[in-house]
Swiss-Prot record:
Binds TFR through the extracellular domain in a pH-dependent manner. It comes from the Eukaryota. Keywords: Cell membrane, Disulfide bond, Glycoprotein, Ion transport, Iron, Iron transport, Membrane, Signal, Transmembrane, Transmembrane helix, Transport. Gene3D superfamilies: Immunoglobulins, MHC class I-like antigen recognition-like. Residues 23-114 are annotated as: Alpha-1. Residues 23-306 are extracellular. This is Hereditary hemochromatosis protein homolog. Binds to transferrin receptor (TFR) and reduces its affinity for iron-loaded transferrin.
Length: 348
């Protein structure tokens, strides 16, 4: 895959990180995704930003328009508010910072401006106990590159070629302190404001409909646990064997996907030994549930009836065949008895 094909793919990967499988139930998050391309062709922007609250898109910004555009009904009336203007100014500042960082990284790699991309994800999460966690990560040409550590005010290099930029940025302590102030103070405050605006929309909770289905293919028995029609999309699904968690490596999971009606769906599957299906339980946690929900595979009544009918027919066929065989044997025995009393006449 060439450099031009990577940006869209990596951006999709970033979007998947927004999915709440990585965010605990009953927490809230504010995330910004930035992407830029060194060449303005093939539909790739120099800088584009998308903002998400609890995984719901609420704002978009690009280098050409240089303004924040609302992407959710619950923020439409805030275009002229002081906080929205501050948000717009922040995005303009990030626009400039992003481009400067982009050129710095390319220079440190001795790269020309042809066919390179930069991606950033930054934001914060607020847990149910009001504790917070901030994050600020860079990706270059589709690979993890640098991550800011607010506790130590330094940068962690995800690859060796990022070391030069890491050392250069760590000299700038003013920027590091500004980054930490945003992650630990400004971001949680902005998130609280947005949650207030979205009250009644963002705080709605629709519990999932959970069912377990049974599949047999190529001599492999699989149980699939489906969670349907839930909101918000942060959900935790796991398999239990004899009430103990199964290693996640043994299970196949599906990303949380929109259902098309404002709700979400997901599933997790597990291959099990035939005949041991009842030992496995699917456990689901979701903000709409007061406690974890469990579900097991229940053989359907129709399957039971079909099995019973087939078994009954098989028994009847066997009895019928035994009866026919019995009659044939009796006839043979009768024929042998008649032949025993018959004597051939002598020739005269």
């Amino acid at each position: 895959m060439g450099p031009r094909a990577r940006p869209a793919l990596f951006f999709l990967i970033l979007l998947r990180t927004v999915a709440a499988q990585g965010r605990p139930p009953r927490s809230h998050s504010l995330r910004y995704l930035f992407m830029g391309a060194s060449e303005r062709d093939h539909g790739l922007p120099l800088f584009e930003a998308l903002g998400y609250v609890d995984d719901e898109l609420f704002v978009a910004y690009n280098h050409e328009s240089r303004r924040a555009e609302s992407r959710a009904q619950w923020v439409l009336g805030e275009a002229h508010s002081q906080l929205w203007l501050q948000l717009s100014q922040s995005l303009k500042g990030w626009d400039h910072m992003f481009i400067v960082d982009f050129w710095t990284i390319m220079d440190n790699h001795n790269h020309s401006k042809e066919s390179h991309t930069l991606q950033v994800i930054l934001g914060c999460e607020v847990q149910e106990d009001n504790s917070t966690r901030g994050f600020w990560k860079y990706g270059y040409d589709g690979q993890d590159h640098l991550e800011f550590c607010p506790e130590t005010l330094d940068w962690r290099a995800a690859e060796s070629r990022a070391l030069t930029t890491k050392l250069e940025w760590e000299v700038n302590k003013i920027r590091a302190k500004q980054n930490r102030a945003y992650l630990e103070r400004d971001c949680p405050e902005q998130l609280q404001w947005l949650l207030e605006l979205g009250r009644g929309v963002l705080d709605q909770q629709v519990p999932p409909l959970v069912k377990v289905t049974h599949h047999v293919a190529s001599a492999v028995t699989t149980l699939r646990c489906q969670a349907l029609n839930f909101y918000p999309q942060n959900i935790t699904m796991r398999w239990l064997k004899d009430r103990k968690p199964v290693d996640v490596k043994d299970a196949e999971s599906k990303d949380v996907l929109p259902s098309g009606d404002g709700t979400y769906q997901s599933w997790v599957a597990l291959a099990v030994p035939p005949g041991e299906e009842q030992r496995y339980t699917c456990q689901v946690e979701h903000p709409g549930l007061d406690q974890p929900l469990t579900a097991t595979w229940e053989p359907s009544l129709s399957n039971t009836l079909v099995t019973g009918v087939i078994s009954g027919i098989a028994v009847c066929v066997i009895i019928f065949l035994i009866g026919i065989l019995f009659r044939i044997l009796r006839k043979r025995q009768a024929s042998r008895g008649a032949m025993g009393d018959y004597v051939l006449a002598e020739c005269e």
